[in-house]
Amino acid sequence: MRRLTACVKATILICAGLAGFLSHPHSAAAFDRNKAQLFAVLPDGGTLPEGLAVAPNGDVYVATFDGSKKIFVFNENGGLLRTLTVNPSSGFLLGLGFHPQTHAFLVIDFGAGKVLTVDPQSGGASDFITLATPAGSGLNALTFDAAGSVYVSDSFKGAVWKSGPTGASGLTTPWVQNVLLTTTGDPPFGANGLAFNKAGSILFVANTGNDTIVQIPVSGGTAGTPAVFVNSINGADGLIIDDQDNIWVAANQSDEIVVTDNTGKVLAKLGDFDGLTKDGTPNGLLFPASPDFSRDKKTLFVTNLALDLRVGTGNPANVAIDSAWTAQVKHWTVSKINTQFQALPNK
């Protein structure tokens, strides 16, 4: 009887302890992932959405990386407004943005190794930035500083190019070039998304193949020595910075948006991949590429490139954990995520 009584007491104590643990407000803390919702499905035939930018009026511009020369323009509710055919161009379009001062619509033509000025109504294009030697370049993403200068990442040369507010012709020397902006990893893209902190004193650059964010100190428009800011963002792709200097990064190999503070401490991991519908449409994030905020900053829009790396790199052996899923995609999407998230408790 004493042994039974002791067992009962022990069981009661264990259960009480477990109940207390489970009821503790911080015991089950986890990332509040803010489910990625469908914003828009590209029209039939539209594939590989990569670049994304929100216009001053709130419209969402989405560039395709499929050779079609297409940019799709959606309203803030995801309704298709028009389809632009960017001409002349190679059709392999990546980063895009609206100049904060001139309001020029700039689009990277990856295939031609240049940056274009594009008419946002007609799609007519002209050169904005050209390189003296475009062969071997990998122009990918762009951003602006307070003076209106334009900065363009080069994934293959491990560099960032710079022009003034009106562009440049025949650039020969990158603004900065460094081994930390190159990669031998996978996906095989080095310098990618980039953005300045609010003080304009640091340019942050994602390195996709290295899973890193690199910080470049800036003084008087001149680049300092790059250094690794933070590691382990799986496939760090597009990158933007909010008004609190938090850094939002599309992690294209883990199908999530990673948010860090200005010290590199992770604050949130948002979104996830939730499989495909019967018609081959992704639920949630699948190879998220380029994020941007809505005008009121309450929503994050992000393209789902859904790229099969075996096809994208031309190497059948280049299998990623999402390859079997991306191979089944029939309809490409843009997602939206609520930017208000519950921060983890910080004891």
Where are these regions (language model features)?
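A short helix->beta-strand "capping" segment at the edge of beta-propeller domains
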Residues: 30-46
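Beta-rich, blade/repeat-based domains predominating
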Residues: 44-59, 87-105, 132-150, 180-202, ...
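Residue position within the beta-strands of beta-propeller blades
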Residues: 61-63, 107-108, 152, 205, ...
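Short loop/turn segments immediately following the C-termini of beta-strands
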Residues: 65-66, 110, 155-156, 165, ...
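Structural signal for beta-propeller blades
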Residues: 68-71, 113-115, 158-161, 211-213, ...
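Short loop/turn segments that connect beta-strands within beta-propeller blades
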Residues: 74-79, 119-124, 164-168, 217-222, ...
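Asp-box/WD-like beta-propeller blade repeats and closely related beta-sheet repeat scaffolds
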Residues: 112-149, 153, 157
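Blade-level signature of beta-propeller repeat domains, shared across WD40, Kelch, NHL, RCC1
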Residues: 292-347
